[in-house]
């Protein structure tokens, strides 16, 4: 955990100095768990409750910082499905847990695609079977949470890097092909 904290410190580019220890993080996590546990006990409800949490505008704005919404909506449904595991893992990580209905809404909001539950739920079940997600069954829904954040990002990052590399290679080939086409057009024009 200390290595992870050190990596986080390096990634944060701020002028302010931050100091915290593993015990500080443990205290925060314990306090957060106890406050949720106490609130649950005070309700006197024996079955676990889950409150839907829509993807925040801040999270959507983060993505809009890279691509505007209209561009995200031009991404083909089959491309969204091809990257669905990575998309689901990242959305669940952003939310700190989600049910399938919320994830379907998030995908619709981000990509403008209307995937069926029959497409999304098998991916969620597979990710849970692979140990990437913890699944909690409640009365009317299943809630999915990232089981190991570090392992998740170690899985997602190479997949994203492969996709970016593939896209860059295609873009470079397209630019080269277009340049050759223009050169051929000029040569033919000069010969006339």
Curated annotation (Swiss-Prot):
Superkingdom classification of source: Archaea
Extra remark beyond the main annotation: Encoded in a 14-gene locus called mc-vac.
Record's function text: Plays a regulatory role in gas vesicle synthesis, activates transcription of the gvpA operon, and probably of the gvpD operon. Gas vesicles are hollow, gas filled proteinaceous nanostructures found in some microorganisms. They allow positioning of halobacteria at the optimal depth for growth in the poorly aerated, shallow brine pools of their habitat.
GO terms for MF: DNA binding
Regulation of its activity: The amount of protein that accumulates is controlled by GvpD; GvpD causes a reduction in the amount of GvpE, preventing accumulation of excessive amounts of gas vesicles.
Keywords, in A-Z order: Activator, Cytoplasm, DNA-binding, Transcription, Transcription regulation
GO cellular component assignments: cytoplasm
Annotated protein name in UniProt: Transcriptional activator GvpE
Known partners and oligomeric status: Interacts with GvpD, also with c-GvpD from H.salinarum.
Segments of this protein annotated with the region Leucine-zipper: 150-181
InterPro entries per the UniProt record, alphabetical: ArsR-like_HTH, Tscrpt_reg_PadR_N, WH-like_DNA-bd_sf, WH_DNA-bd_sf
UniProt-annotated binding residues for DNA: 140-145
Localization annotation: Cytoplasm
Main location: cytoplasm
Intrachain S-S bonds: none
Induction trigger: Transcribed from mid-log to stationary phase, probably as a gvpD-gvpM RNA. Highly expressed in 25% salt, poorly expressed in 15% salt, no gas vesicles are formed at 15% salt at 15% salt. Accumulates in late exponential to stationary phase (at protein level).
Gene3D superfamilies: Winged helix-like DNA-binding domain superfamily/Winged helix DNA-binding domain
């Amino acid at each position: 955990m200390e290595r992870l904290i050190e990596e986080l410190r390096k990634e944060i580019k701020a002028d302010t100095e931050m100091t915290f220890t593993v015990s500080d993080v443990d205290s925060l996590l314990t306090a957060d768990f106890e406050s949720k546990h106490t609130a649950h006990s005070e309700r006197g409800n024996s079955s676990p409750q889950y409150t839907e949490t829509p993807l925040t505008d801040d999270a959507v704005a983060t993505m809009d910082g890279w691509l505007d919404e209209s561009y995200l909506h031009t991404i083909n449904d089959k491309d969204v499905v091809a990257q669905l595991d990575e998309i689901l893992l990242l959305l669940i990580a952003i939310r700190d847990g989600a049910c399938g209905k919320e994830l379907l809404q998030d995908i619709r909001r981000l990509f403008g695609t209307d995937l069926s539950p029959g497409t999304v739920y098998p991916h969620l079940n597979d990710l849970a079977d692979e140990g990437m997600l913890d699944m909690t069954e409640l009365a009317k829904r299943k809630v999915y949470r990232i089981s190991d954040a570090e392992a998740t990002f170690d899985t997602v990052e190479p997949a994203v890097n492969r996709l970016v590399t593939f896209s860059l290679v295609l873009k470079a080939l397209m630019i080269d092909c277009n340049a050759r086409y223009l050169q051929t057009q000029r040569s033919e024009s000069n010969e006339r």
